[in-house]
């Protein structure tokens, strides 16, 4: 019996592209979840909770399918940096990251409403930005790239020249820890590289 199909519970074009890059076949469907952090919630727990909520929301619409939910967050000095809504918020976030190291955590959950198994994992990467001169900061903020990105930047996009170091998984910083996700998909029989 063939493995049940995979559904990606995300509208992220970056997650879509990364999974396709390694030959994973999947459908895309995303649901709405409350993304507000809870008081005192640790960043890793927050990311794990959201990834599972996203997976469960879509699994309710696709019983019997494995659903992959993911969430990426950026933290510095214990502060969670979400997605900036305005140019001023983006400017403030990038300025806060300038010349400093921060943590990017991506959590993922694989869930099937008809199975007893749930796979959840959070992966952390450290990213250091160079000291960003005002003219480069203003140029980047004016590109409008920051607005749908945790921490206000896309490491694979126009902000790539701001990054001086990455320790850990690059794909995790992009939005999906591909090594860990593929291993989990292999464990569930949802992807195989034999005979390809």
Language-model features, listed with the residues they occupy:
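Anionic-ligand binding patches
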Residues: 2-7, 41-196
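Cofactor-binding loop segments of dinucleotide-utilizing enzymes, especially the Rossmann-like FAD-
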Residues: 11, 31, 113
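Short glycine-rich, Thr/Ser-proximal phosphate-binding strand/loop in the N-terminal lobe
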Residues: 23-40, 118-124
């Amino acid at each position: 019996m063939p493995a049940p199909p995979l559904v990606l519970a995300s509208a992220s074009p970056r997650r879509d592209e990364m999974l396709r890059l390694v030959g994973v076949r999947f459908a895309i469907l995303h649901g709405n979840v409350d993304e507000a952090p809870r008081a005192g919630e640790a960043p890793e727990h927050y990311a794990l909770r959201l990834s599972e909520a996203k997976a469960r929301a879509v699994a309710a619409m696709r019983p019997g399918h494995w659903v992959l939910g993911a969430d990426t967050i950026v933290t510095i000095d214990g502060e969670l940096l979400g997605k900036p809504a305005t140019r001023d918020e983006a400017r403030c976030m990038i300025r806060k990251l300038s010349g400093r190291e921060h943590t990017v955590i991506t959590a993922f959950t694989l869930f099937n409403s008809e199975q007893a198994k749930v796979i959840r994992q959070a992966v952390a990467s450290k990213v250091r930005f160079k000291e960003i001169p005002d003219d480069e900061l203003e140029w980047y903020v004016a590109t409008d790239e920051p607005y749908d990105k945790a921490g206000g930047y896309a490491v694979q996009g126009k902000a790539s020249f701001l990054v001086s170091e990455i320790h850990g998984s690059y794909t995790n910083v992009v939005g999906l820890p591909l090594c860990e996700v593929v291993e989990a998909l292999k464990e569930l029989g949802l992807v195989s590289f034999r005979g390809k």
